[in-house]
Amino acid sequence: MPEATSQKSSSESAVYQRYASAARQREDALCCPVEYAADFLSVIPAEILERDYGCGDPTPFVLAGETVLDLGSGGGKLCFILAQVVGKKGRVIGVDCNREMLGLARRHQQTVADRIGFSNVDFRYGLIQDLKLDLDLLGRELEQHPVRDPADWLTLRHLEERLRHDQPLIPDDSVDCVVSNCVLNLVRQQDRRQLFAEIFRVLCRGGRAAISDIVADEDVPAHLERDPELWSGCISGAFREDKFLEAFEEAGFHGIQVVKRQRDPWRTVEGIEFRSVTVVASKGKQGPCLEANQAVIYRGPFKKVEDDDGHVYPRGARMAVCDKTFHLLQRKPYSGLFDAIEPREAIPLDEALPFDCRRSKQRDPRETKGTDYHVTTESAGPCCGSDGPCC
């Protein structure tokens, strides 16, 4: 067997076996200490709290009433915290491929529901890099139609595709927020592009990902990547810190932010520092670019900034933008950074012409005010309010 194939299979096997064991007995080496609000923890059974393995806290980026997906939900601690954050009108879905961890979470599901007064958590069996395939459904099909020969294997592949299409584990555009806590680094390198594509697929337009994970300040050398113990311990599979952000960008996210970065490394191996970061990224910049004579002015403090579509905004300059970008820049995480300038006469979008978003250009004020705008007005009152003169 080629070395690369052997390493891939051994790393996957090591992850499964180590976390299956950790579902039965706590393993401190898998844990990067994280503190959560005590009132959220009080309803969660001790067995789950003792089997929690994470490195960050993405819960502050989840809102009441939202549908939230937890990738690699493990014993369910984060899901049970989120159940209280989203409340009775919200919904939490946990996905994990480790049956022992999934069993631990499901075993205490009703207990937590009784304690908080409602049931809004669902644990599903699947791979986080393949959120279309429901492994519980696949398992039931295999019980009735086991694979005995190559022909059966081909039939199985067709079955998988049918299940992905007809009964996806997580449908397209169905989730407001995707969270994960120290799990993405456990996914094989060759599956990571699909992993981020799946996160993007399941999010609603305007939704966000809030991901806590371990990153490295340097490339992890091959001999460390081949170590199953280090891989399953969230070390040798760690993303390089800049590549982690690039993965979100390549998947189509925008507004990508490192909202928390551990100052001191969690571990150092052969001089390479490994630490926890939490990244928030948004979905919603895709779509047609239409000209509505709108403009934005970047307030500063930087001399200029560039967005994820390559638009450049010099400080203080009135820049032309399409209708989509105009509204995007007024929402988080950009809100407060730009002044938005509406045209004096609105252009209905069904009458708007295409806007060329491939280049950045300044908007002539007459485009928003109109060439026939020659109004002269008197002072409308103190320009700085009632506290004193404006100069």
Regions found by a protein language model. Name each.
Residues 251-391:
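C-terminal lobe and adjacent flexible extensions of AdoMet/dcAdoMet transferase-like proteins
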Residues 193-208:
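A short glycine-rich, Lys/Arg-flanked "PGG" loop and its adjoining helix->strand segment in the class I
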Residues 135-142, 153-178:
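A short acidic, Gly/Pro-enriched loop at the edge of an enzyme's catalytic core
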Residues 105-106:
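Conserved SAM-binding loop
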Residues 98:
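Conserved SAM/SAH-binding beta-strand->alpha-helix loop
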Residues 215-235:
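Short, glycine-/aromatic-enriched active-site segment of Class I SAM-dependent methyltransferases
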Residues 31-67, 78-81, 85:
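Conserved alpha-helix/loop element of class I SAM-dependent methyltransferases that forms part
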Residues 237-252:
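Short alpha-helix
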